[in-house]
Design a protein with these regions (language model features):
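An N-terminal assembly and electron-transfer interface module characteristic of large anaerobic redox
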Residues: 7, 136, 169-171
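Amphipathic interaction/junction segments at domain boundaries or subunit interfaces
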Residues: 9-13, 17-124
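Short, hydrophobic/π-rich interface segment
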Residues: 97-157
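Short, charged/polar, Gly/Pro-enriched secondary-structure boundary elements
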Residues: 118-121, 168-175
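Short, cationic low-complexity segments
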Residues: 140, 178-193
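Domain-exit/linker segments immediately C-terminal to small folded modules
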Residues: 149, 171-184
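C-terminal edge-of-domain segments
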Residues: 152, 158-168
């Protein structure tokens, strides 16, 4: 958005908007000429390292199999949810995080997004084939803090992106398997016995 703002300041509102539109069209043409993408596995590794590497360090002292750490991550989810909802009032296109009460029975922290700017961008710019690379990284990130993510969908393949986080040794973690859906998203499916 900085570039668009700069164009408007330099060339005026109308001309700045025209230039921004031309830039976007040119960029779209450029994307059509890009060579084939590398294998998904290679891209997944890159995206995961880029966005989730902090979880490796965090996992050295944070362990979701400890009740205090589960309580703490729930508090973090609650605070982030409060912050997101305040931002949502000011910036309606941002993440909309809905915190859920801590599940004391199952020792599970839950929240969900009803809106994700990454998913909206991917839909608008026909980049849905890339979106799973970002969404799927969450599983790896949570595993680095000795947890398991149980997710039924994301804003890319469902009406919400749900997070149910439990310790990796929690019996609930063993009730699910992670599968890849037809669009490339990792999702949790309850095991049938």
């Amino acid at each position: 958005m900085f570039r668009k703002k700069w164009l408007k300041a330099r060339y005026g509102e109308e001309e700045g908007n025209k230039l921004w539109e031309l830039i976007n069209r040119q960029y779209d043409k450029y994307l059509e000429d890009l060579p084939d993408y590398p294998p998904v596995e290679e891209l997944q590794e890159l995206v995961t390292k880029l966005f989730m590497s902090g979880f490796v360090k965090l996992g050295k002292f944070f362990n979701l199999n400890r009740s205090f750490d589960m309580w703490l991550i729930n508090k973090v989810f609650q605070k982030i949810g409060e912050k997101d909802r305040k931002l949502y009032a000011q910036y309606p296109a941002c993440f909309c995080n809905i915190s859920e009460p801590y599940d004391k029975k199952n020792h599970a922290a839950r929240y969900h997004f009803t809106q994700c700017p990454n998913a909206e961008f991917a839909k608008k710019h026909t980049l849905m084939h890339v979106l799973p690379l970002f969404c799927n990284s969450d599983y790896w990130g949570i595993s680095q803090i000795h947890g398991t993510l149980i997710r039924h969908g994301t804003c890319g393949n469902s009406d919400k992106c749900d997070y149910c986080v439990v310790g990796s040794e929690n019996p609930m973690a063993k009730e699910y398997e992670i599968i890849k859906d037809e669009d490339g998203f990792l999702v949790s499916r309850k095991l049938e016995y």
